[in-house]
């Protein structure tokens, strides 16, 4: 899992499963990878059950939890996370030295430096559906693989993801939009922004 092997990032997400073998796999990747690692969905569930593995790594680590996953990571309730989203994200990112994307309305992006915090204003409730978080994690992985610094990659991915959701909602309605339609709108936005 070394950058010199041509691997530019690793993403562990939905479908990974949570069992003895995948716990071992995630632990080994965190210990050995020199490229950025993105944990989402099952990757986060594994980390929540074995939280110390987050400190035993050498590569940049980015986590993209929703409030329920964040509650599992912190050992509290989702209501407690929602009551202080910026504080929870900031504390966790600083304690574990990670870049954290706390998904939800006004997604919070926190870096390991206490001063590194962004609150995103793009996005809408129509994005709260299966596959939307996978699109975000894929965007984040793409930007990280291109060498963008983790906090900047997270902020850019979250902003563009939300903007694509806003454009999709405008064209198809919040009820009619899908992550696939968001991805199509993202392609148009990237072309418009020159990316």
Q: In which residue ranges do the predicted regions lie?
A:
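Single conserved hydrophobic/aromatic residue that forms the stacking wall/gate
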Residues: 1-15
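Glycine-rich phosphate/dinucleotide-binding loop and adjoining beta-alpha-beta core of small-molecule
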Residues: 15-122
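N-terminal loops that bind phosphate or other acidic moieties
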Residues: 53, 114-115, 140, 147-148, ...
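Short, small-residue alpha-helix embedded
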Residues: 71-72, 129-160
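Short beta-alpha connecting loops at secondary-structure transitions
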Residues: 73-74, 120-127, 137, 141, ...
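Short, charged, surface-exposed loops that flank catalytic or proteolytic processing sites
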Residues: 78-85, 147-155, 173-177
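Feature representing long, continuous alpha-helical segments
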Residues: 87-90, 118, 137-138, 151, ...
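Charged C-terminal helix
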Residues: 163-195
